[in-house]
C-alpha cells in the first residue's frame, strides 16, 4: 500500500480492512494479528490498531484486552436491524417514484440487468452490480444519496448476503427477482414492485437459517463470549 500523508494512509487502511471483513476475506471469528496485517500492508502497527478500533465501533471487530482482536461473527440481530432500515428506505423510495422516470437511469438499470445475467461473473462482480441496481432504483426516486447512509449501516447484513451467495450455485434467482422489480417499476405498478422488493430483501433470513444449521461458528450467539484464538475457514 502506497505511503501518503498520515490521515490519508489511515483512511486507506481502515477502508481496506473493512472491505476485507465485508467480503469475508477476513472470515467471521478469525483472529487478527496487528503485526501480520501491518506487514502485509507495508505499514506500521499504529494505523492498523486505529483502524481496528474504528471497526470495533461499527461492530465488525471485537477487541479483548490481553487476548487479542477478532473479526466479529455475523450477528443476526444486527442483520435484522440493518434489514429493517434498508427495507424501510427502499420501499419508501418506490413510493416516491415520479410519474415520469428518468430515461437515462432506466437505461443504466436495464444495462445492469444484462450484465447480471453474464455466466462468467464472480461473486464480487455480481455483488457490485446488485448494489448498483438498488442504488439506481433509489436514484429514480430522487433519493440516491440516501444509499450512502444505508450502505454504512449494513456491514453485518452484507456479510450475511455474501454467505448466502456462496451457498447458491448461481445468482440466477436474484437476477430474476431484480427483473421482476424492474419490470414492475417501469410499468408503474408500485404495489407489485413493493411486494417483489420485500420478498427479495427478506431472502437473507432464509439464508442465515440454512447456513447457521451447518456452520454455527460463523454467527454470534452471546456478545460476552470470549472467542478461542483460531482462524475460521468460511469455505474451502
Swiss-Prot record:
InterPro entries recorded: GntR_C, TF_FadR/GntR_C, Tscrpt_reg_HTH_GntR, WH-like_DNA-bd_sf, WH_DNA-bd_sf
Family annotation (SUPFAM superfamilies): GntR ligand-binding domain-like, Winged helix' DNA-binding domain
Key word Amino-acid biosynthesis present: no
Molecular functions (GO terms): DNA binding; DNA-binding transcription factor activity
Domain HTH gntR-type: start-end pairs: 7-74
Entry keyword annotation includes Transcription: yes
Keyword set, alphabetical order: DNA-binding, Transcription, Transcription regulation
Name listed for the protein in its UniProt record: Uncharacterized HTH-type transcriptional regulator in unstable DNA locus
Listed SMART domains: FCD, HTH_GNTR
Alphabetical list of Pfam families matching this protein: FCD (PF07729), GntR (PF00392)
PANTHER family for the chain: GNTR FAMILY REGULATORY PROTEIN, TRANSCRIPTIONAL REGULATOR, GNTR FAMILY
DNA-binding region (UniProt annotation): 34-53
